[in-house]
Amino acid sequence: MNDSEFHRLADQLWLTIEERLDDWDGDSDIDCEINGGVLTITFENGSKIIINRQEPLHQVWLATKQGGYHFDLKGDEWICDRSGETFWDLLEQAATQQAGETVSFR
């Protein structure tokens, strides 16, 4: 994968997250902000999830209250380089815990 393809795929990931949060109809207030390649999700309780792209490594990084995760694209899924879990699974687990209610991005 070259840099432009990586950015296209990361942009697509950011857009999906932003669209899902725009459509969010849960009880919790969840905000999303994108600034310079960093996507920050802020929850009503003040906690945050931060997602950023690491261009030199062609990775997406996810920082949550539970820890930090690094994802490589394998096929059509972003996969954690330590646990083998998908980006969406880990994001949903963290968002659900931090929101205090079920959050789905799929």
From Swiss-Prot:
Binds iron under oxidative stress conditions, but not under conditions emulating the intracellular redox potential. One of its GO terms (cellular component) is cytoplasm. SUPFAM superfamilies: Frataxin/Nqo15-like. Coiled coil: none annotated. Gene3D superfamilies: Frataxin/CyaY (3.30.920.10). InterPro entries: CyaY, Frataxin/CyaY, Frataxin/CyaY_sf, Frataxin_CS. GO terms for molecular function: ferric iron binding; ferrous iron binding. Disruption phenotype: Cells are not affected in cellular iron content and sensitivity to oxidants. It comes from the Bacteria. Changing E18K: Abolishes iron binding and increases kinetics of Fe-S formation on IscU. Belongs to the frataxin family. NCBIfam families: FeS_CyaY (TIGR03421). This is Iron-sulfur cluster assembly protein CyaY. It comes from Escherichia coli (strain K12). The gene is cyaY.
